[in-house]
């Protein structure tokens, strides 16, 4: 029966409300009680009064084991964090006049990234007068997207940004794996 909560949860004597709508440890409604009556009832069964809905009128409190409640809350948060996936964006840089072997090497690397479910940004930097032949870069990016279509979808079509043209590929994720 601790009365000190390290987070913002109000328990036992730390509850500021004078009256509470009380829920018993087995889930039954005990009605509106004063804070002191609620604490007295909780002490009889060796449990804590925990404020679960502070903004309700009157605030809702439940009789429960605070330590167990806190443990369950942490477990739920841990599960939620485990299910989250951080999406990383990997960049592959090409040139508008890339040779076939270099293209295939970059393609192989991009496919590895897509298999790991990372997004891939494919960019082409135009140097000097090459900017006048944007269609070369466009063709290279379209060929790259075509080669990856079994693993990825085009999230953003080839687009110019200053002296660079880029394409964004997102992995195709199977819903069955999750």
Swiss-Prot record:
Protein name: Translation initiation factor IF-3
Function: IF-3 binds to the 30S ribosomal subunit and shifts the equilibrium between 70S ribosomes and their 50S and 30S subunits in favor of the free subunits, thus enhancing the availability of 30S subunits on which protein synthesis initiation begins.
UniProt-listed NCBIfam families: infC (TIGR00168)
UniProt similarity note: Belongs to the IF-3 family.
One GO MF term: ribosome binding
GO biological process, one term: ribosome disassembly
Matches recorded under InterPro entries: T_IF-3_C_sf (IPR036788), T_IF-3_N_sf (IPR036787), Translation_initiation_fac3_CS (IPR019813), Translation_initiation_fac_3 (IPR001288), Translation_initiation_fac_3_C (IPR019815), Translation_initiation_fac_3_N (IPR019814)
CC per GO annotation: cytosol; membrane
SUPFAM superfamilies, A to Z: Translation initiation factor IF3, C-terminal domain, Translation initiation factor IF3, N-terminal domain
Oligomer and partners: Monomer.
Compartments it resides in: Cytoplasm
